[in-house]
């Protein structure tokens, strides 16, 4: 947090425009992520709240939520306020038997979801129906006004998120009244071999590989920090 003397600065303005972030070189100094690992509400005021803190606010509608933050020492991520669980996507729109992304076969050690997503977008952006596959859907995901940096997480990143799955699921059900996670598996952007890719079955606490042509859901994320 930036301080003026001993006072925390909570709003930074450039003229009449509110500044969302300040960097010193490549280091983000405003705003800071929460110091404690866990699940947070990212509010429209661009602050992170624990769920108990959020419940004390005057307006606790989902419309006040820009996303849910997973803060972990191995990686922190912003998740959408609500995931479209009714849509099914193939892993890629074509070339189901082709190597597409790097780090093939490393499985849970892959933490390069953003890179994987960009490679697939570059490969398929001119293919008819290119938004009908998991990484294409995630790349074009713009549900809230916080930028266009969404991507399909790698299997390693999904497993970090999965550590907080029960807490996030319970909190969202209690406060907002809907189930955040689906009974369907989530595709990762990690390829296992020429014909299969990794997915996370959050409902059954398992991860495995599946044929790229199979239909599963997708969880877009933004990397934080």
Regions from the PLM with identified roles:
Residues 4, 14, 71-72, 179, ...:
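A generic structural signal for short, solvent-exposed coil/turn residues
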Residues 1-32:
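Intrinsically disordered, compositionally biased repeat/linker segments
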Residues 12, 69, 185-189:
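Short hydrophobic/aromatic-rich beta-strand motifs
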Residues 11, 21, 31, 87, ...:
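A broad, structure-centric signal for solvent-exposed, well-ordered loop/edge residues
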Residues 7, 17, 27, 85, ...:
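Generic structural motif
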Residues 1-5, 54-60, 170-183:
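Short, solvent-exposed secondary-structure boundary motifs
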Residues 147-149, 155-225:
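C-terminal, surface-exposed recognition/capping segments
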Residues 23-146, 212, 218-225:
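Short, compositionally biased
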